A protein has these predicted regions:
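Active-site phosphate/pyrophosphate-binding segments
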Residues: 1-136
Length: 136
């Protein structure tokens, strides 16, 4: 795509080397749509940097990523729960749930393992059908 754009003199936004497509949300390619939709790009980037700082902590209960990974390991490997559901109760958060599903599937689904299957659901829509099945 980039070579086509260069050949036809179409401007493009840079994606830093080593940044996979699913993480480009934090690059100019991902930040431009946020800005065009009126989102607060600076607040978004500050939030990402803040989470990165938290995820560098070495104390388990101060590191949300390590804590989530630990909980998921226990639920999956020790308890046998093979599905990881992200179910926001806001329609506005539906795309975040789907993005999380993509991140988990693409990051952990590359090799045959016992990783949980990620699933996105919407609270009020799915709680009366899927949630009943999961809780049975």
């Amino acid at each position: 795509m980039r070579s086509y754009c260069a050949e036809h003199h179409i401007a493009t936004l840079p994606i830093p080397p080593g940044v996979g497509g699913r993480y480009c949300i934090f690059t100019p390619v991902g930040l431009l749509p946020l800005a065009l939709l009126g989102g607060d790009v600076n607040a978004f980037v500050r939030g990402a940097k803040g989470m990165d700082t938290l995820c560098q902590k070495t104390v388990l209960d101060e590191n949300p990523a390590a804590l989530l990974a630990s909980i998921q390991y226990v639920l999956n490997a020790k308890k046998g729960y093979g599905v990881r559901v992200i179910m926001p109760y806001s329609q506005r958060m539906q795309s975040v749930a789907r993005w999380n599903q993509q991140l988990i599937a693409e990051s952990l689904g590359k090799v045959e393992t016992q990783n949980p299957i990620p699933m996105a659901a919407i609270g009020t829509q799915d709680q009366h059908s899927l949630l009943q099945q999961w809780m049975a």
